[in-house]
From Swiss-Prot:
InterPro entries attached to this UniProt entry: FeS_biogenesis, FeS_cluster_insertion, FeS_cluster_insertion_CS, HesB-like_dom_sf
UniProt key word Nucleotide-binding: no
Molecular-function annotations in GO: 2 iron, 2 sulfur cluster binding; 4 iron, 4 sulfur cluster binding; iron ion binding
Function: May be required for efficient nitrogen fixation.
Organism annotation: Trichormus variabilis (strain ATCC 29413 / PCC 7937) (Anabaena variabilis)
Name of the protein described by the UniProt record: Protein HesB, heterocyst
A Gene Ontology BP annotation from the UniProt entry: nitrogen fixation
Length: 123
């Protein structure tokens, strides 16, 4: 399972996780990434702060950020790159997903075609 955080995304997440810690010893927090049905294109990205992975989550580390990926969402997220972009009007995380056949204008939801090695549709 490959999820890549750019340097800017890792920096922002690290700062956010440090700021959300309840005490100085809390260092096990990470982010959990998944997708759900929704959004204007079919699937919607979810990114939550968590201290514990779910039993079937795939776990990796990007820099000093723990990344938990929902196992059911993994085929849809394989190879995703998460960046943090800043602009005049808005700033936020940008998802570049090689499995997306199209994305909505806001970039928060996507449509996926065949994203599994066996040729089984993602949905």
């Amino acid at each position: 399972m490959t999820v890549t955080l750019t340097e800017k995304a890792e920096f922002r997440l690290r700062a956010f996780l440090r700021g959300s810690a309840k005490d100085a010893n809390e260092t096990t927090k990470g982010i959990r990434i998944s997708v759900k049905d929704g959004g204007c294109s079919g699937y919607e990205y979810l990114m939550d702060v968590t201290s514990q992975p779910q039993p079937d989550d795939l776990v990796s580390q990007q820099g000093s950020v723990l990344v938990y990926v929902d196992a059911k969402s993994a085929p849809l997220l394989e190879g995703i790159v998460i960046d943090f972009v800043e602009g005049l009007v808005e700033s936020g995380f940008k998802f570049t997903n090689p499995n997306a056949t199209s994305t909505c204008g806001c970039g928060k939801s996507f449509k996926a075609g065949d994203c599994s090695p066996e040729g089984v549709p993602c949905s």
